[in-house]
């Protein structure tokens, strides 16, 4: 493939954008090489500035569940922009969006719109601290909740040690308020609550880890956290920015049958536009200003164009059988990838929940961040580039989930698997 225009653009971008990008993973640092620059997208495909076409399994990191540039979403945006781009005042679409979310996610009795997933998680944690009068939070290895200071923390040597910052600029005093656990560790969660339970405002978790590739919860794990939070008076926050409306119509909480106190959303509810939301029990949400004393605001929150796009997308995912078909297509892809790897003599396993999937270069079932980081990253990187050269775009990191859309039909999946058979053969050489 020719990437001359992308190469020139990346060189130009590095003179005016830190690292040449506006989000680190886009720079291909994890896999090596240089990123391609996208000119347009349609259905299951991306087209770069050099005219190359790629089958896309990133889907803008999750929101494009019905495929890129879906006519219903595009037309909703076109209608909305005729009336204006931003009002800074209430509009009918934000009420409809809130009613839609509360109708689909029973744990959310009220919703507040924001502008990003990061903003949603930051706001939910502030609400949890304000509502409980406590300051500490618990998060999990491999779970990403945006770039807020409280979330850029990893565990020290042992589960009960204080958190230490993973980014310069995060005050140590703030990071000490975040404790980190291993995902799917039942005993560790119990022990940590026994140690610091009265200080914990909230547990925040990706119910399916999507930022350490794709790691589902073990049976009963989310319910175990629900029980611990209830017992110790802490709130349970599900970060459903990735999983919301993707793994099931009601999100991971519906899929696993566990009810959080607060939930955060993004991606799909904007149909590709910048958006976020958090919601939960009425008694909690009514503590947010102006109804209550816990402050949170945003100039562009409830933006009418983003609301129009999101409402159109949510109509699409409510079509009968949508999630069943999406899950079946994702399963077909995963089984085909494993078969192709097996034929090439390469150890590969997959995880899948609904329209999310993960590809791991290992024989082991991956159920933790430690297992994910122990996989053969070098082979993944070689496979990534071999697929890219064959016109298939996977997430440019071994630690990111893949995303299926309803536009990935049987023909697209077979083309992907044909490329994978050749790519695995390259890796095996």
UniProtKB/Swiss-Prot annotation:
GO BP annotation list: protoporphyrinogen IX biosynthetic process
Main location: cytoplasm
Subcellular location: Cytoplasm
One Pfam short name: Aminotran_3
E.C. number(s) listed in UniProt: 5.4.3.8
Record keywords, A-Z: Cytoplasm, Isomerase, Porphyrin biosynthesis, Pyridoxal phosphate
Reactions catalysed, as given in the entry: (S)-4-amino-5-oxopentanoate = 5-aminolevulinate
GO cellular component, one term: cytoplasm
Swiss-Prot/TrEMBL cofactor(s): pyridoxal 5'-phosphate
MF (Gene Ontology): glutamate-1-semialdehyde 2,1-aminomutase activity; pyridoxal phosphate binding; transaminase activity
Residues bearing PTM N6-(pyridoxal phosphate)lysine: 267
InterPro entries in alphabetical order: 4pyrrol_synth_GluAld_NH2Trfase (IPR004639), Aminotrans_3 (IPR005814), Aminotrans_3_PPA_site (IPR049704), PyrdxlP-dep_Trfase (IPR015424), PyrdxlP-dep_Trfase_major (IPR015421), PyrdxlP-dep_Trfase_small (IPR015422)
Pathway connected to this protein: Porphyrin-containing compound metabolism; protoporphyrin-IX biosynthesis; 5-aminolevulinate from L-glutamyl-tRNA(Glu): step 2/2
NCBIfam families: hemL (TIGR00713), PRK00062.1 (NF000818)
Assembly and interaction partners: Homodimer.
Family according to the record: Belongs to the class-III pyridoxal-phosphate-dependent aminotransferase family. HemL subfamily.
HAMAP family according to UniProt: HemL_aminotrans_3 (MF_00375)
Protein name stated in the entry: Glutamate-1-semialdehyde 2,1-aminomutase
Organism: Xanthomonas oryzae pv. oryzae (strain KACC10331 / KXO85)
Gene: hemL
